[in-house]
A protein has these predicted regions:
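Conserved acidic catalytic loop of the alpha/beta-hydrolase fold
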Residues: 1-19, 28
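Conserved hydrolase catalytic core segment
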Residues: 16-55
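Alpha/beta-hydrolase-fold enzymes
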Residues: 40-42, 46-131
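Active-site nucleophile elbow and catalytic-triad environment of alpha/beta-hydrolase enzymes
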Residues: 127-128, 143-163
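Acidic catalytic loop of the alpha/beta-hydrolase fold
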Residues: 131, 150-152, 177-182
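Short alpha-helix in the alpha/beta-hydrolase fold that links the catalytic acid
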Residues: 156-161, 169, 180-192
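Short beta-strand/loop motif that positions the catalytic acidic residue
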Residues: 167, 173-175
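Catalytic active-site module of serine/aspartate enzymes centered on a nucleophile-bearing elbow/loop
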Residues: 188-189, 196-228
Length: 228
C-alpha cells in the first residue's frame, strides 16, 4: 500500500511533506512509510494504531473471513458474490470498532425494562451490514482483512523496537481509552521507542471509532502538535 502511495507522490513531484498522518490501517501505512523513507515527512501522527497486528485483532478478522466463506456465492466470478457473507462480517467488525460502552450508550432500547426479542441493536447490526453491502465488494473486503493481519513493521527488518528507532520525523501518538482493537497498551511500544515523540490519550466511550467521533479532542491535539 505504501509503495503505491510513494509512486503517486513521485509522479506528483512531492519530495517531502510537513505532516504524514494516519489512523487505524492508515496508521499502519504511516508507520511503514516513516521507516521506508525516514526523510519524507517533517512530522508524523500515528492515531489508534499499532506497529504489529496482534492475535486479538487477527481473531476478529478471521471470524469475518469465515462469515464471507459461508456465503454459498463466495468464489463465483461476480462482483455480487459473497455480499451476504460480507454483511455478516461487517456486523462482527462493528463490535470490535465500537466495544461494549458505545453499544450500551447508543443502542439501548427506549424502555429497557420492557425490551423484548425485537431489540434496537438487532436492526442496527443488520442495517450496517446491508449499508456496506450496497457499496463494497466481498473480495476486496477479504483481501483488506488479510492486509491488516500481515502488518508487521519488524518483518524482514529485525525487532520492532529497533525499527521504530529509525523514525526521524517528530512524531505524535494518539490512543483512545476504550479502544479494544488497538488499546492504549499497544501504543506503549511506539512511545517508548520512537526517538522524538509525544503521546496523548483521547477519552471516549466509542472505542476504536473514537478517532472518528471525538473530532474536538483530536483536532486540538493535532493543531497543538503542529504549532510546536
Amino acid at each position: 500500500m505504501v509503495r503505491a502511495h510513494q509512486l503517486l507522490a513521485e509522479w506528483l513531484g512531492i519530495k517531502r511533506v510537513k505532516l504524514l498522518i494516519g489512523s487505524s490501517i492508515g496508521g499502519f501505512q504511516c508507520l511503514e512509510w516513516s521507516v521506508m523513507q525516514p526523510d519524507f515527512a517533517e512530522r508524523a501522527a500515528f492515531i489508534a494504531t499499532t506497529p504489529r497486528t496482534k492475535p486479538w485483532a487477527s481473531a476478529f478478522n478471521e471470524s469475518q473471513r469465515m462469515a464471507i466463506e459461508c456465503d454459498p456465492t463466495y468464489g463465483e466470478r461476480s462482483a455480487e458474490a459473497g455480499l451476504q457473507g460480507m454483511a455478516t462480517a461487517r456486523s462482527i467488525a462493528l463490535m470490535s470498532y465500537r466495544g461494549g460502552m458505545a453499544y450500551d450508550k447508543t443502542q439501548e432500547d427506549e424502555n429497557p425494562d420492557e425490551a423484548s426479542f425485537e431489540r434496537r441493536v438487532l436492526s442496527y447490526q443488520r442495517y450496517q451490514g446491508e449499508k456496506l453491502r450496497r457499496r463494497f465488494n466481498a473480495y476486496s473486503y477479504y483481501r483488506l482483512s488479510q492486509a491488516v493481519d500481515s502488518h508487521n513493521l519488524g518483518r524482514g527488518r529485525g525487532k520492532v523496537e529497533d525499527v521504530l528507532q529509525q523514525i526521524k520525523a517528530k512524531s505524535l501518538v494518539v490512543a483512545i481509552t476504550s479502544d479494544i482493537l488497538f488499546p492504549p497498551s499497544d501504543h506503549t511500544i511506539l512511545v517508548e521507542n520512537i526517538p522524538n515523540v509525544e503521546y496523548h490519550l483521547i477519552d471516549s466511550d466509542f472505542g476504536h471509532d473514537g478517532f472518528l467521533v471525538e473530532h474536538k479532542q483530536l483536532n486540538e491535539i493535532i493543531l497543538n502538535f503542529l504549532k510546536e
